[in-house]
A protein has these predicted regions:
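A short helix-coil junction within the Rossmann-fold of NAD(P)-dependent oxidoreductases
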Residues: 23-32, 118
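Residue(s) in the substrate-gating loop at a strand-loop-helix junction
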Residues: 41
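Active-site-adjacent segment of SDR/Rossmann-fold oxidoreductases
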Residues: 46, 62, 67-77, 118-120
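C-terminal helical subdomain
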Residues: 81, 99-176
Length: 176
């Protein structure tokens, strides 16, 4: 993949979302209400072979959503993301026919409609595939305080405790 190919996909998926949001933002702010729905992808959330450009752009949309949810909250502007898996021209050669038959795009629609409704949450990523819906989110564990004198050796020696996922939390901003 050339850098031009990489940039083209980022321009379409990430900058396209930014341009569209930028166009409607003043209107939503003025009316003190709005709903924006980004279309991210499981490829952006988890990665996918051969899709580094697409994956980077789609996860970039999640970062955009995370900031927009904070900036828009005071004006009742909710920004959410949907991560669909559906049978489309883009996926028809990636999955067997019997799988594609269960992934009609119409099965993504209920989640999309909810995420732009008056009752929509703010800052949520819903995955939708074949009638199954789930939350995707960034989590953080409790970590381990090694102190201000920590070295790379300290991190290595305590790595298992640092990455222990027994207790998870979500939070929006770095809290010290």
């Amino acid at each position: 993949m050339t850098l031009d190919d990489f940039e083209m996909v980022v321009n379409v998926h990430l900058l396209g979302a930014a341009y569209c949001s930028h166009a409607v933002w003043p209107i939503m702010r003025e009316q003190n209400y709005g709903r924006i729905l980004m279309t991210t992808s499981p490829s952006g959330l988890y990665g996918n072979f051969g899709q580094t450009n697409y994956s980077a752009a789609k996860l970039g949309q999640v970062g955009l959503m995370n900031s927009m949810k904070i900036e828009g909250a005071k004006n009742n502007i909710h920004t959410n993301s949907i991560a669909p898996v559906a049978a489309t021209r883009m996926t028809e050669n990636l999955m067997p026919e019997e799988v594609l038959e269960k992934l009609g795009p119409e099965l993504v629609t209920p989640a999309a409609i909810f995420l732009v409704s008056e009752d929509a949450p703010n800052g949520v990523i819903l995955q939708a595939q074949g009638g199954q819906y789930s939350l995707a989110t960034v989590v953080e564990n409790n970590g381990l305080d090694l102190g201000v004198e920590a070295s790379a050796d300290d991190v290595a020696a305590n790595y298992e405790a640092i990455v222990d996922m027994a207790e998870l939390k979500t939070r929006g901003m770095l809290q010290l």
